[in-house]
């Protein structure tokens, strides 16, 4: 059995699979983690499970050494980072894998083995949109994340206070809460749909949504398929390729 880890800018997401059922645990991303701290925080999740490998996608390089030590000292397992890719499995269009976020590569691996033509919208710290056609990663778009856009607005505008985001059934807000909800929720909906229409004007691509901020936009993105923890699933695919 393996342990999978998605190191994002906001959260660390751990997952392992028993009898085709994934179990997940989330910790906040902190740069002062030690391997002992991780072990203590994960004690109730890991219990007495034995792992052969810790498979990692990381966009926070400063944590990589700690993760290696954690795997070696506490898990007694080998560690595998996304550090190579086979062109026949996922064509990066001439780019080095190091120039592309490993979370994007993990998601693209998941997609490339299941769909001929797919657009993925990953709603995390950033909103990332990328297109995979015939196992080729065409490229990506990175925009401010939904939650960060909202928090940035509230923090930078002195007269605005935090509100509950709820989409009104009209095109113009009648008060500050409605106006902010429209700007953040419908604004991100139009941003996403605008890029989808540019990338896939004929509507032939499979559209997939993933990421922790999906809950904020699920009411406006309900026409698209949601895949929970796509990075973890992509890490499982990565292990199967390179084990």
UniProtKB/Swiss-Prot annotation:
PANTHER family: TYPE III PANTOTHENATE KINASE (PTHR34265:SF1)
Positions of disulphide bridges: none
InterPro entries registered for this protein in UniProt: ATPase_NBD (IPR043129), Type_III_PanK (IPR004619)
HAMAP family for this protein: Pantothen_kinase_3
Protein name: Type III pantothenate kinase
Pfam families: Pan_kinase
Gene3D superfamilies on file: 3.30.420.40
GO biological process: coenzyme A biosynthetic process
Annotated substrate binding sites: 101-104, 176
Residues given in the record as ATP binding sites: 6-13, 125
Its job: Catalyzes the phosphorylation of pantothenate (Pan), the first step in CoA biosynthesis.
Uppermost EC category: transferase
EC assignment: 2.7.1.33
Cofactor dependence: NH4(+); K(+)
């Amino acid at each position: 059995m393996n342990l999978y880890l998605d190191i994002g800018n906001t959260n660390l997401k751990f997952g392992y699979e028993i009898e085709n059922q994934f179990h997940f645990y989330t910790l906040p991303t902190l740069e002062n983690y030690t391997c002992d701290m991780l072990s203590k925080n994960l004690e109730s999740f890991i219990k007495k499970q034995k792992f052969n490998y810790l498979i990692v996608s990381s966009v926070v390089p400063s944590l990589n050494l700690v993760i290696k030590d954690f795997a070696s000292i506490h898990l007694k397992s080998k560690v595998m980072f996304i550090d190579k890719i086979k062109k026949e499995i996922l064509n990066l269009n001439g780019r080095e894998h190091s120039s592309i976020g490993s979370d994007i590569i993990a998601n693209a691996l998941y997609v490339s083995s299941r769909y001929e033509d797919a657009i993925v919208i990953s709603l995390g710290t950033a909103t990332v949109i990328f297109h995979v056609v015939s196992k080729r990663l065409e490229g990506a778009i990175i925009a401010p994340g939904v939650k960060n856009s909202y928090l940035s607005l509230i923090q930078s505008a002195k007269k605005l206070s935090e509100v509950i985001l709820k989409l009104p059934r009209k095109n113009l807000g009648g008060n500050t809460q409605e106006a902010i909800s429209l700007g953040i929720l419908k604004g991100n909906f139009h941003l996403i749909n605008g890029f989808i229409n540019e990338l896939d004007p004929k509507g032939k691509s499979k559209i997939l949504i993933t990421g922790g901020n999906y809950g904020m936009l699920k009411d406006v993105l309900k026409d698209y398929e949601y895949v929970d923890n796509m990075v973890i699933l992509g890490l499982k695919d990565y292990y199967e390729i390179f084990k």
